[in-house]
Amino acid sequence: MADGVFSVLLVDLDDFKEVNDTRGHAEGDRTLIWVARFLERNVRDHDIVCRTGGDEFVILLPNAGEAGSSLLIDRLRSALDAANAGRVTPIGLSIGSATWPDNGSSAERLLESADMAMYQTKQRRKAARLPAKTIPMRVRAMEDETLPWGGPTSGS
């Protein structure tokens, strides 16, 4: 790599199970094909788009650091907003990014970092769709889940 960095984006479809359950697996398959083509159309020529399984995709960005991956994420969001305008069932994507070597020195660690970032994005997107009165309870529940011992945040 020319400048010694590259980034990995982990892309997960939001609410994909609902598409399969309510519209059928054939529609789910068409949705996955649509997303794969959408991603391929909106990355640079030398970027690599892979479906890793289920409703997850990985995009490898050679010679792109954090700034480059952020630009691509913004471009994907804008293009997705435009593409969703004509869709009966809008598609949502949660995207996490990680940059080598800052976020991991091995492929496994880099993917773990991108996965954690994607999960945080997905949680923020879900929280944004909750009625306002349920958000504090949701935040508390997420805090409880992150404690290393799995116990309550206050108490005994």
Feature-to-residue mapping (PLM):
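Nucleotide-sugar donor-binding/catalytic module of glycosyltransferases
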Residues: 25, 46, 79, 102-103
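Catalytic core regions of nucleotide second-messenger enzymes
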Residues: 51, 80-94, 126-131
